[in-house]
Protein backbone atom coordinates (compact mmCIF):
# COMPACT_ATOMS: atom_id res chain seq x y z
CA UNK A 1 0.00 0.00 0.00
CA UNK A 2 2.93 2.37 0.58
CA UNK A 3 3.67 2.40 -3.14
CA UNK A 4 0.05 3.13 -4.03
CA UNK A 5 -0.20 5.91 -1.45
CA UNK A 6 3.00 7.48 -2.75
CA UNK A 7 1.41 7.92 -6.17
CA UNK A 8 -1.10 10.46 -4.80
CA UNK A 9 -3.74 9.57 -7.37
CA UNK A 10 -7.15 11.19 -7.52
CA UNK A 11 -8.77 7.91 -8.55
CA UNK A 12 -7.44 4.37 -8.03
CA UNK A 13 -8.56 1.22 -9.87
CA UNK A 14 -7.32 -2.15 -8.59
CA UNK A 15 -7.86 -5.47 -10.34
CA UNK A 16 -7.32 -8.16 -7.69
CA UNK A 17 -8.44 -11.80 -7.78
CA UNK A 18 -9.03 -12.04 -4.04
CA UNK A 19 -11.51 -9.21 -3.59
CA UNK A 20 -15.15 -8.69 -4.49
CA UNK A 21 -16.10 -5.72 -6.62
CA UNK A 22 -16.38 -2.74 -4.31
CA UNK A 23 -16.33 1.01 -4.62
CA UNK A 24 -15.01 3.13 -1.82
CA UNK A 25 -16.31 6.54 -2.79
CA UNK A 26 -14.73 8.38 0.11
CA UNK A 27 -11.29 7.26 -1.08
CA UNK A 28 -12.05 7.16 -4.79
CA UNK A 29 -10.88 3.56 -4.98
CA UNK A 30 -12.50 0.87 -7.11
CA UNK A 31 -11.45 -2.71 -6.44
CA UNK A 32 -12.54 -5.48 -8.80
CA UNK A 33 -11.92 -9.20 -9.02
CA UNK A 34 -13.90 -9.63 -12.24
CA UNK A 35 -11.27 -10.49 -14.84
CA UNK A 36 -14.07 -11.66 -17.13
CA UNK A 37 -14.95 -8.02 -17.77
CA UNK A 38 -11.52 -6.47 -18.30
CA UNK A 39 -12.87 -4.21 -21.00
CA UNK A 40 -15.34 -2.55 -18.63
CA UNK A 41 -12.70 -2.22 -15.90
CA UNK A 42 -10.25 -0.55 -18.29
CA UNK A 43 -12.97 1.68 -19.76
CA UNK A 44 -13.89 2.91 -16.26
CA UNK A 45 -10.25 3.79 -15.61
CA UNK A 46 -9.97 5.55 -18.98
CA UNK A 47 -13.22 7.47 -18.43
CA UNK A 48 -12.08 8.61 -14.97
CA UNK A 49 -8.79 9.95 -16.29
CA UNK A 50 -7.96 13.46 -17.38
CA UNK A 51 -4.90 15.60 -17.98
CA UNK A 52 -5.65 17.51 -14.78
CA UNK A 53 -5.81 14.64 -12.29
CA UNK A 54 -3.89 11.41 -11.86
CA UNK A 55 -5.55 8.02 -12.23
CA UNK A 56 -3.71 4.99 -10.90
CA UNK A 57 -4.49 1.53 -12.28
CA UNK A 58 -3.14 -1.53 -10.45
CA UNK A 59 -3.10 -4.95 -12.11
CA UNK A 60 -2.36 -7.73 -9.62
CA UNK A 61 -1.13 -11.02 -11.10
CA UNK A 62 -1.14 -9.47 -14.59
CA UNK A 63 0.47 -12.60 -16.04
CA UNK A 64 -2.91 -14.38 -15.63
CA UNK A 65 -4.91 -12.12 -17.95
CA UNK A 66 -2.75 -9.39 -19.50
CA UNK A 67 -1.29 -11.14 -22.54
CA UNK A 68 -2.77 -9.92 -25.81
CA UNK A 69 -5.49 -7.96 -24.03
CA UNK A 70 -6.44 -4.91 -26.14
CA UNK A 71 -8.05 -2.90 -23.28
CA UNK A 72 -4.89 -3.22 -21.17
CA UNK A 73 -2.70 -2.42 -24.19
CA UNK A 74 -4.67 0.79 -24.78
CA UNK A 75 -4.07 1.91 -21.19
CA UNK A 76 -0.36 1.17 -21.51
CA UNK A 77 0.08 2.81 -24.91
CA UNK A 78 -2.05 5.92 -24.48
CA UNK A 79 -2.63 6.29 -20.75
CA UNK A 80 0.38 8.52 -20.20
CA UNK A 81 -1.31 11.16 -22.38
CA UNK A 82 -4.24 11.16 -19.94
CA UNK A 83 -2.26 11.07 -16.68
CA UNK A 84 -2.79 7.33 -16.11
CA UNK A 85 -0.11 5.60 -14.05
CA UNK A 86 0.03 1.78 -14.02
CA UNK A 87 1.37 -0.63 -11.43
CA UNK A 88 1.48 -4.27 -12.55
CA UNK A 89 2.45 -7.12 -10.24
CA UNK A 90 3.69 -10.53 -11.29
CA UNK A 91 5.86 -13.28 -9.87
CA UNK A 92 8.21 -13.65 -12.81
CA UNK A 93 9.72 -11.45 -15.54
CA UNK A 94 9.32 -14.19 -18.11
CA UNK A 95 5.56 -14.25 -17.54
CA UNK A 96 4.99 -10.51 -17.91
CA UNK A 97 2.96 -9.55 -20.97
CA UNK A 98 5.09 -8.00 -23.71
CA UNK A 99 3.19 -4.70 -23.46
CA UNK A 100 4.06 -4.51 -19.75
CA UNK A 101 7.75 -5.15 -20.38
CA UNK A 102 7.95 -2.73 -23.29
CA UNK A 103 6.13 0.14 -21.59
CA UNK A 104 7.49 -0.13 -18.04
CA UNK A 105 10.28 2.21 -17.00
CA UNK A 106 10.64 1.22 -13.36
CA UNK A 107 10.62 -2.19 -11.69
CA UNK A 108 10.62 -3.06 -7.99
CA UNK A 109 12.39 -6.41 -7.96
CA UNK A 110 12.51 -8.82 -5.06
CA UNK A 111 14.81 -11.84 -4.93
CA UNK A 112 14.94 -13.72 -8.25
CA UNK A 113 16.27 -17.27 -8.34
CA UNK A 114 14.46 -18.74 -11.35
CA UNK A 115 17.01 -19.43 -14.10
CA UNK A 116 14.75 -18.17 -16.90
CA UNK A 117 14.22 -14.84 -15.13
CA UNK A 118 17.91 -14.43 -14.33
CA UNK A 119 18.69 -14.99 -18.02
CA UNK A 120 16.17 -12.30 -18.94
CA UNK A 121 17.81 -9.88 -16.50
CA UNK A 122 21.30 -10.62 -17.86
CA UNK A 123 20.32 -9.08 -21.21
CA UNK A 124 19.71 -5.69 -19.58
CA UNK A 125 21.77 -5.59 -16.38
CA UNK A 126 25.34 -5.95 -15.27
CA UNK A 127 26.56 -9.23 -13.84
CA UNK A 128 26.91 -7.52 -10.45
CA UNK A 129 23.31 -6.28 -10.46
CA UNK A 130 21.96 -9.73 -11.39
CA UNK A 131 24.05 -11.23 -8.59
CA UNK A 132 22.66 -8.66 -6.15
CA UNK A 133 19.08 -9.49 -7.16
CA UNK A 134 19.62 -13.23 -6.83
CA UNK A 135 20.99 -12.74 -3.31
CA UNK A 136 18.42 -10.32 -1.91
CA UNK A 137 17.11 -11.11 1.56
CA UNK A 138 13.41 -11.81 2.15
CA UNK A 139 11.21 -8.72 1.73
CA UNK A 140 14.09 -6.64 0.33
CA UNK A 141 14.00 -5.19 -3.17
CA UNK A 142 15.94 -3.09 -5.63
CA UNK A 143 14.55 -0.52 -8.02
CA UNK A 144 15.50 -0.95 -11.66
CA UNK A 145 15.00 1.88 -14.13
CA UNK A 146 15.07 1.34 -17.87
Protein language model regions, located:
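Phosphate-binding and hydrolysis-coupling loops of NTP-dependent motor/remodeling domains
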Residues: 119-146
Amino acid sequence: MELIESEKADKVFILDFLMEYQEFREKDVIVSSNIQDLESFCEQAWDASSKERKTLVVFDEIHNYGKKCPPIEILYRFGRHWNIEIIAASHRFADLPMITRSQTQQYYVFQVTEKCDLEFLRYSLSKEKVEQISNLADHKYVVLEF
